[in-house]
Amino acid sequence: MALLAEHLLKPLPADKQIETGPFLEAVSHLPPFFDCLGSPVFTPIKADISGNITKIKAVYDTNPAKFRTLQNILEVEKEMYGAEWPKVGATLALMWLKRGLRFIQVFLQSICDGERDENHPNLIRVNATKAYEMALKKYHGWIVQKIFQAALYAAPYKSDFLKALSKGQNVTEEECLEKIRLFLVNYTATIDVIYEMYTQMNAELNYKV
């Protein structure tokens, strides 16, 4: 669980403004999460998350004061790009990033909630399938969907996944799940606010890749 516990997201302030710098720092440690899933087929999601973090950081670094919050990024780029927005810049990168982050959130929440295949309780296929269908499937074309369906069948045992997530530390399953629940508190709240922001600003795009 060390992978998640070491980099908790900050609690949201009352105005729900998400500071760009601390957000990027926290999520930059998440791509190795996909290594814990064992299958190289998850590598594209890992690469997508890393690439989009890099794109957002490049914009942020040009003017940290101007882009202090994620909300600032969308507002400034909407003014800057006009009719091209939201298909450009950090706005587009954050749109895809939030989907990868949602995959992680739904997957971990499903495991914490005890959702499983009763015939194969130590498999995490049910959890990974739910996460993919809720976070990413609708944005993928038929070929990409088939690739990921194959990957889901190659997902590791839950015990092996939790051990990888704990970086080999000798902790019980319940201790690991408790730390995941702690991680999810601020993480889920943050992802929800980003989704709300895209809805409110009409910045969500539904094209497939």
From Swiss-Prot:
Impact when changing residue 48 to V: Significant inactivation; 15% residual activity
Tissue and organ expression note: Detected in fibroblasts (at protein level). Detected in fibroblasts and in various cancer cell lines.
The entry's keywords: Acetylation, Cytoplasm, Lipid transport, Repeat, Transport
Keyword Heme belongs to the record: no
GO CC list: cytosol
Source organism superkingdom: Eukaryota
Stretches for region 2 X 12 AA approximate tandem repeats: 45-66
Protein name as catalogued: Glycolipid transfer protein
Lineage of origin: Eukaryota, Metazoa, Chordata, Craniata, Vertebrata
